[in-house]
Amino acid sequence: EEAKMEFSKYPEKVCFTGNPRAQEVSTVQKKAALEAYNLDSEKPTVLIFGGSRGAKRINDAFVEALPELVTKNYQVLMATGDIHFETIKSQLAKMANGKFNVSVVSYISNMPEVFSTVSLVVSRSGATTLAELTALGLPSVLIPSPYVTNDHQTKNAESLVNKHAALLIKEPELTGNRLVQTLD
């Protein structure tokens, strides 16, 4: 319905069809997908990612939050994007002194399986990601990219925030402290 306002010149041509990817995600059965990332499939898990290529600002906030995140009762799976992976992995390694509740990967190829096992998602607010999250009823913290046409990711995020289905952090307000406070 909200899209009709964006295409107000021809509202009769707007037709709701759904998102085929969202339907695929909704049929995935919960599996022990987290074990592939050395995480406990029985613990609450937060997935953090900034899209397939990663997002520097989200990654920076994650690194800043690491000292706090490793002390939490929940676990974190962080997908950094290929460009940022080695830097962030080395930050985590500097803190290594035992088993962590944080796993860092460059990319998640089995996202439908992972979505079916996590408790909360922190991500950008692209249309396909939000379709997948809403299909599964996953709570989310959305950080819209400020670098997209017509600020559509903010509009996408606000549609869920207005329905009390997500929280929103604007990228300029994102810090490690803000991330941890929001997750807690």
Describe the function of each predicted region.
Residues 1, 17-20, 143-146, 169-173:
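Short beta->alpha connector loops at strand-helix junctions that form conserved
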Residues 2-10, 129, 150-157:
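Short, glycine/polar-rich helix-capping loops at beta-to-alpha or helix-loop-helix junctions
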Residues 111-152:
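A donor-sugar binding/catalytic signature common to diverse glycosyltransferases
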Residues 3-14, 89-90, 95, 114, ...:
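Short loop/helix-cap segments at secondary-structure boundaries that form the rim of catalytic
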Residues 1-31:
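Active-site-proximal region of nucleotide-activated glycan assembly enzymes
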Residues 30-32, 39-120, 154-157, 162, ...:
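Donor-nucleotide binding loops and adjacent catalytic segments primarily
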Residues 9-12, 72, 98, 136-137, ...:
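Short, structured coil segments at secondary-structure junctions
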Residues 1, 50, 80, 123, ...:
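Short beta-strand/turn micro-motifs composed of small residues
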